[in-house]
């Protein structure tokens, strides 16, 4: 996914994860993750290698590879793969 595609994918709207949590990525680089009414605020960015990463204060950084989730020719969500741990999770556009 190109940097332009990353930005477009993340800022396209609210996403809902498989566990019901929601997240919004703002063009400014701010992000809000809400799980069972509890909101956590962080930052997202594209690093020097053109890869997506999250920063959650005070010091946690998480690098991810992103892939589109496509159904019947339409983009319906994103698959996140942690670049260091290999864990994966999916989210759909709300």
Language-model segments: residues:
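Lipid interaction determinants
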Residues: 1-94
């Amino acid at each position: 996914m190109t940097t332009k595609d990353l930005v477009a994918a993340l800022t396209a709207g609210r996403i809902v994860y498989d566990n019901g949590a929601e997240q919004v990525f703002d063009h400014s680089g701010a992000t809000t993750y809400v799980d069972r009414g509890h909101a956590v605020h962080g930052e997202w960015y594209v690093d020097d290698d053109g890869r997506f990463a999250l920063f959650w204060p005070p010091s946690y950084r998480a690098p991810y590879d992103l892939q589109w989730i496509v159904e019947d020719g339409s983009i319906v969500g994103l698959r996140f793969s942690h670049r260091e741990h290999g864990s994966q999770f999916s989210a759909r556009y709300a």
